[in-house]
Amino acid sequence: MSTGFFGNLQPISYEGPQSDNPLAFRHYNPDEVVLGKRLEDHLRFAVCYWHTFVWPGGDPFGGQTFERPWFGDTMERARLKADVAFELFEILGVPFFTFHDADVRPEGASYSESVARLNDIADYIAAKMEKTGVRLLWGTANLFSHRRFMAGAATNPDPDVFAYAAATVKACIDVTKRLNGENYVLWGGREGYETLLNTDLGRELDQLGRFLSMVVDYKHRIGFKGAILIEPKPQEPTKHQYDFDVGTVYGFLKRYGLEDEVKVNIEQGHALLAGHSFEHELALAATLGIFGSIDMNRNDYQSGWDTDQFPNNAPEAALAYYYILQAGGFTTGGTNFDAKLRRQSLDPEDLVAAHIGGMDICAQGLKAAARMIEDKALSGPLEERYSGWNATEAQAMLKGERSLEAIAERVARENLDPKPRSGRQEKLENIINRYV
């Protein structure tokens, strides 16, 4: 039985690029075959629980603007929230969803009550998954909202908070496994510090390393087949976060011997906060062998914080999916919309329209990326740029067959005087726009 929240809205269909129907897909046809795979299987779209069904529409200067019938701290409201969530999943035709424990159940008076409520709602959600065929892309624990975590979870100076966080993650991994989740995510929003004056940096990093090692050990002990993912972010809410960016996370994983066990979930907005482009973080993660999944959104170009808006820039999406496809595409990961409505967008239809737009932009970007790969539009010029390294002498230098002295001798003997060559950046940028 329908909740009635979305009125008479029917499942969204593909009508093609010429359609002017605001509630239809113009670029996303889930069954369209691209590079030998259905578009749905390339993109693996997911709707997130937190921004879509939990966020009240507040900002630092004003409170709640959204009035949702499921808002409240009872299990009855939690079940209504799940009812509405799965209605949206079916309207959009998305194959996946994502959640934090605190998104799906109200906080209990104790740890045990919170876990009992999580298990209760997990049974309810499992029945809906069975009925609809919608799957869980990943689960995670909210270790940042409650005041107990104000000084961190794994990095907290109080060992009891560390223990509480560890127990919470165990419960969330258990539920993620029970719901056949394909990944488990850890985001360290409070894992960092505001000032070094009250922070033992080395101790906190070691605590975080031990915590993550326990998570990996537990995954293997219970036979959870999904990937463990860290989501990098440089700041916000914490001033200095330990999972700053992909490079920082990789260094952390190497230090604690976890580089073969943990991958990254990369968010577009977090990449920008770290001073990088989205494609930089994607390409680096792929190069380092730790690419896992993405949170797709965008930040406002003028604001200096994480605005979590729905994506609307096709060239940016094309570059992102270009590097994802070059890395072999998603395996357990997917495209999770970590994006929220603007606080004035009050209508149920706004939730649908926002996701339609995001899904269309991603589809448009991926199809452009696929065409660039097929035509070698970017890889051809790249191969040419580095072609000199195919020469015998160049290969000998790379393989360690030439010492510094031997190279210096050859440079002097051959009177080498290399001339600069154009990087052709503008031509390459024009290619992106042409394919989009």
Swiss-Prot record:
Keywords: Carbohydrate metabolism, Cytoplasm, Isomerase, Magnesium, Metal-binding, Xylose metabolism. It catalyses: alpha-D-xylose = alpha-D-xylulofuranose. It is found in: Cytoplasm. Its cofactor is Mg(2+). SUPFAM superfamilies: Xylose isomerase-like (SSF51658). The keyword Magnesium applies. The keyword ATP-binding does not apply. Mg(2+) 2 binds at E267, H270, D306, D308. GO terms for biological process: D-xylose metabolic process. Binds 2 magnesium ions per subunit. InterPro entries: Xyl_isomerase-like_sf, Xylose_isom_bac, Xylose_isomerase. Mg(2+) 1 binds at E231, E267, D295, D338. Signal peptide: none annotated. GO terms for cellular component: cytoplasm. Its main location: cytoplasm. Its EC number is 5.3.1.5. GO terms for molecular function: magnesium ion binding; xylose isomerase activity. The active site is at H100, D103. PROSITE patterns: XYLOSE_ISOMERASE (PS51415). Belongs to the xylose isomerase family. Homotetramer. This is Xylose isomerase. It comes from Chelativorans sp. (strain BNC1). The lineage of its organism: Bacteria, Pseudomonadati, Pseudomonadota, Alphaproteobacteria, Hyphomicrobiales.
